[in-house]
From Swiss-Prot:
Cited SUPFAM superfamilies: Cation efflux protein cytoplasmic domain-like, Cation efflux protein transmembrane domain-like
Lineage of the organism: Bacteria, Pseudomonadati, Pseudomonadota, Gammaproteobacteria, Enterobacterales
Protein name, as recorded: Zinc transporter ZitB
Source species of the chain: Escherichia coli (strain K12)
Induction comment: By zinc.
Underlying gene: zitB
Compartment(s): Cell inner membrane
Transmembrane annotation, as ranges: 21-41, 48-68, 90-110, 122-142, 160-180, 182-202
Record's bilayer topology term: Multi-pass membrane protein
């Protein structure tokens, strides 16, 4: 029986993530003040809805930026994985905030149907167009580039996407009000935009809760991983007791591997580690190698897939 673990890390994507968040925070915070004032002056709920999203965005971007900074702290004896999970927690809080603000906007829109208020279409249009441009800039800052975005940047981008949709909705409502004078267009567009944002927020909430509950990554099929290891690594007879979870954006795995006693134990261990890295991007794996079938009380976890279909070469 043998244990091994491998671990590598890189901070370059985190640096890029932090830079994205900082620039988007500057753009969003600056324009939020303009939109809040404009929303009150014009009397437009669609603008106030967009301003509400921008207010949430500003806090969300700041929180996400702080989380990325904290996540860079090195591991300690007490926090052995460092602070990587803090970014997931920030994404969870961001998703909750987005759900709450969306519900409040829908509630206010319903109130507007009961007691309509005058809306100044011209001012509403000017501010909505400016808001759209600011949101496009923020969204581009968060999304451009090919490197991996972490869950916080995804969360922040969803907030900004909500704002972008809000600005489009405000422009459509402003056009209707300018052309026809029909003010119910304002709360109607607010509700439609809010429902679109709510759908995205729900997806983000599910992803962050899955990570906080240490669920396996949705993209990883554990049964297939076990089958492939038994089929593609000749010495592997059985893979069991597999645990996979996420720490920040990094997948972490522990597993038991029953093997034919190898001529070179360390070479086989190294082969398994490289296999997990190359095929599943798992940089941190703790592997327990066994020469006999495992008889521990919890060794048959995930044993639904037979590990005996393997090839000898």
């Amino acid at each position: 029986m043998a244990h091994s673990h491998s671990h590598t890390s890189s901070h370059l994507p985190e640096d890029n993530n932090a830079r994205r968040l900082l620039y988007a925070f500057g753009v969003t915070a600056g324009f939020m003040l303009v939109e809040v004032v404009g929303g009150f002056l014009s009397g437009s709920l669609a603008l106030l809805a967009d301003a509400g999203h921008m207010l949430t965005d500003t806090a969300a971007l700041l929180f996400a930026l702080l989380a990325v900074q904290f996540s860079r702290r090195p591991p300690t004896i007490r926090h052995t994985f460092g602070w990587l999970r803090l970014t997931t927690l920030a994404a969870f809080v961001n998703a909750i905030a987005l759900v709450v603000i969306t519900i409040l906007i829908v509630w206010e829109a319903i109130e507007r149907f009961r007691t309509p208020r005058p809306v100044e279409g011209g001012m509403m249009m000017a501010i909505a167009v400016a808001g759209l441009l600011a949101n496009i800039l923020s969204f581009w800052l968060l999304h451009h580039g090919s490197e991996e975005k972490n869950l916080n940047v995804r969360a922040a981008a969803l907030h900004v996407l909500g704002d972008l949709l809000g600005s489009v909705g405000a422009i459509i409502a402003a056009l209707i009000i300018i052309w026809t004078g029909w003010t119910p267009a304002d709360p109607i567009l607010s509700i439609l935009v809010s429902l679109l944002v709510l759908r995205s927020a729900w997806r983000l909430l599910k992803d962050s809760v899955n990570e906080l509950l240490e669920g396996a990554p949705v993209s990883l099929d554990i049964a297939e991983l076990k089958r492939r290891m038994c089929r593609e690594i000749p010495e592997v007879r059985n893979v069991h007791h597999v645990h996979v979870w996420m720490v920040g954006e990094k997948p972490v795995m522990t597993l038991h591997v029953q093997v034919i006693p190898p001529h070179d134990h360390d070479a086989l261990l190294d082969q398994i580690q490289h296999y997990l890295m190359d095929h599943y991007q798992i940089e941190h794996a703790t592997i327990q190698m066994e020469y006999q079938p495992c008889h521990g009380p919890d060794c048959h976890l995930n044993e639904g897939v037979s590990g005996h279909s393997h090839h000898h070469h």
